[in-house]
Amino acid sequence: MQVILLDKVANLGSLGDQVNVKAGYARNFLVPQGKAVPATKKNVEFFEARRAELEAKLADVLAAAEARAAKIKELGSVTIASKAGDEGKLFGSIGTRDIADAVTAAGVDIAKSEVRLPNGVLRTLGEHEVSFQVHSDVFAELNVVVVAEA
């Protein structure tokens, strides 16, 4: 099925690309989320008329994401207190929701889906490097310090 992308889609293309995808992927994911429209003659003409508007909107979203990434970097680090044993191992773990809540409490709104933990959840005390994907092209790094609760 031919579709016109209205947004950048990972491993597929960027705004304005006409790509061939499976019908189910287009019908169940791309079209309902507003990331693509079927490539009919009417839609192609409509898209070409609105291309500049859509590109400007995409640039605004990217600029907002870069501003959020800059705010995250300005924080420097976030401290999370958790119960821990004598050897520095946590009772439980610190996951994406805990990190997102701590960063939001520090003043930058982050959804738990934007937190990237390449080594899995945090299970030890100390400093951990955590990355945030605030946009498909924009990443931010932050130190998360896990301390023992008193």
Curated annotation (Swiss-Prot):
Q: Which GO terms describe its biological process?
A: translation
Q: Which PROSITE patterns match?
A: RIBOSOMAL_L9 (PS00651)
Q: Which UniProt keywords apply?
A: Ribonucleoprotein, Ribosomal protein, RNA-binding, rRNA-binding
Cross-referenced Pfam families, in alphabetical order? Ribosomal_L9_C (PF03948), Ribosomal_L9_N (PF01281)
The family database entries (InterPro entries) matched by this protein are listed as: Ribosomal_bL9, Ribosomal_bL9/RNase_H1_N, Ribosomal_bL9_bac/chp, Ribosomal_bL9_C, Ribosomal_bL9_C_sf, Ribosomal_bL9_N, Ribosomal_bL9_N_sf
Q: Which SUPFAM superfamilies match?
A: L9 N-domain-like (SSF55658), Ribosomal protein L9 C-domain (SSF55653)
Keyword field contains Ribosomal protein: yes
Q: Which GO terms describe its molecular function?
A: rRNA binding; structural constituent of ribosome
Highest taxon in the source lineage: Bacteria
Gene Ontology CC: one annotated term: ribosome
Recorded family membership = Belongs to the bacterial ribosomal protein bL9 family.
Q: What does this protein do?
A: Binds to the 23S rRNA.
Query: This chain belongs to which protein, by name?
Result: Large ribosomal subunit protein bL9
Organism (species): Pectobacterium carotovorum subsp. carotovorum (strain PC1)
Tell me the classification of the organism that encodes this protein.
Bacteria, Pseudomonadati, Pseudomonadota, Gammaproteobacteria, Enterobacterales
